[in-house]
From Swiss-Prot:
Assembly behavior: Found in a complex with tRNA(Sec). Interacts with SEPSECS. Component of the tRNA(Sec) complex composed at least of EEFSEC, SECISBP2, SEPHS1, SEPSECS, TRNAU1AP and tRNA(Sec). Associates with mRNP and/or polysomes.
GO cellular component terms listed in the entry, alphabetical order: cytoplasm; nucleus
Single GO biological process annotation from the record: selenocysteine incorporation
Name of this protein: tRNA selenocysteine 1-associated protein 1
InterPro entries per record: Nucleotide-bd_a/b_plait_sf (IPR012677), RBD_domain_sf (IPR035979), RRM_dom (IPR000504), SECp43_RRM2 (IPR034510), TSAP1 (IPR040434), TSAP1_C (IPR041085)
SMART domains given in the database record: RRM
Domain RRM: 3-86, 96-175
MF-aspect GO terms: RNA binding
Cysteine pairs bridged by disulfides in the record: none
Gene3D superfamilies xrefs: 3.30.70.330
Source organism of the structure: Mus musculus
Length: 287
């Protein structure tokens, strides 16, 4: 049974022939390519659907070339692929993820996925985080559908070798609420890992590392596709993220507290009778 992948971040000049040739250059054969266009203007919406002979072929292609340089693209771009459901309900089954650190630059999405899936069949995918120039930041994420396998991987693969040139560093990745606006196309499983807490400057804390729990924060946005309206993808910027642990200025907080306390004290004292001069002083008459 044929299966399709969603492909995004396309330039207007990238037509069906261009997409087919790009996959062929990577050693992949596609059945067909459907460029999605705006119904009113006819202008390409920036994404397409690529059909393969079967689900296994599509899945293999996804893990093999997703994130790799797109042949012939000017300016330089990378394959941005995902599963496509064409309006069907996305898979809402639980997912359990791990943060994978200390990755060397040679590790890509496919290598990360293959390293785990060969031992843990429930591994759903892997993603190496890249900087704007396409260079690995040295860490990534892997997702599982089986929590027990996620926990096994955390224990059994901690410090393991064989993925790049360094032992891997693992930690549980804890999801945070997604703030992605709804868009008009869908992926069954999202591999967009670009939304993280960014409140500090150092390596771990910059990506949501909790030194108390030894965990990282991430978010997997979900999308929905409908045939009625075509709309391009909107990236969520850093302004949509929250600092989960803002710094507290203790000195300023104490100053504000004391000022409020003094105002309250003065108000309470002003509402009392003034003290008498002596014990024998006459009590003032009521006004």
């Amino acid at each position: 049974m044929a299966a399709s992948l969603w492909m995004g971040d396309l330039e207007p000049y990238m037509d069906e022939n261009f997409i087919s040739r790009a996959f062929a250059t990577m050693g992949e054969t596609v059945m067909s390519v459907k460029i999605i266009r705006n119904r009113l203007t006819g202008i390409p919406a920036g994404y397409c659907f690529v059909e393969f002979a079967d689900l296994a072929t599509a899945e293999k292609c996804l893990h093999k070339i997703n994130g790799k340089p797109l042949p012939g693209a000017t300016p330089a771009k990378r394959f941005k692929l995902n599963y496509a459901t064409y309006g069907k309900q996305p898979d809402n089954s639980p997912e359990y993820s791990l943060f994978v650190g200390d990755l060397t630059p040679d590790v890509d999405d496919g290598m990360l996925y293959e390293f785990f899936v060969k031992v843990y069949p429930s591994c759903r995918g892997g993603k190496v985080v890249l900087d704007p120039t396409g260079v690995s930041k040295g860490y990534g994420f892997v997702k599982f559908t089986d929590e027990l396998e996620q926990k096994r991987a955390l224990t059994e693969c901690q410090g393991a070798v064989g993925l790049g040139c360094k032992p891997v560093r693992l930690s549980v990745a804890i999801p945070k609420a997604s703030r992605v606006k709804p868009v008009e196309y869908s992926q069954m499983y999202s591999y967009s890992y670009n939304q993280y807490y960014q409140q500090y400057q150092n390596y771990y804390a910059q990506w949501g590392y909790d030194q108390n729990t030894g965990s990282y924060s991430y978010s997997y946005p979900q999308y929905g596709y409908t045939q009625s309206t075509m709309q391009t993808y909107e990236e969520v910027g850093d302004d949509a993220l929250e600092d989960p642990a803002p710094q507290l200025d203790v000195t300023e907080a104490n100053k504000e507290f004391m000022e409020q306390s003094e105002e309250l004290y003065d108000a309470l004292m002003d509402c009392h009778w003034q003290p008498l001069d002596t014990v024998s002083s006459e009590i003032p008459a009521m006004m």
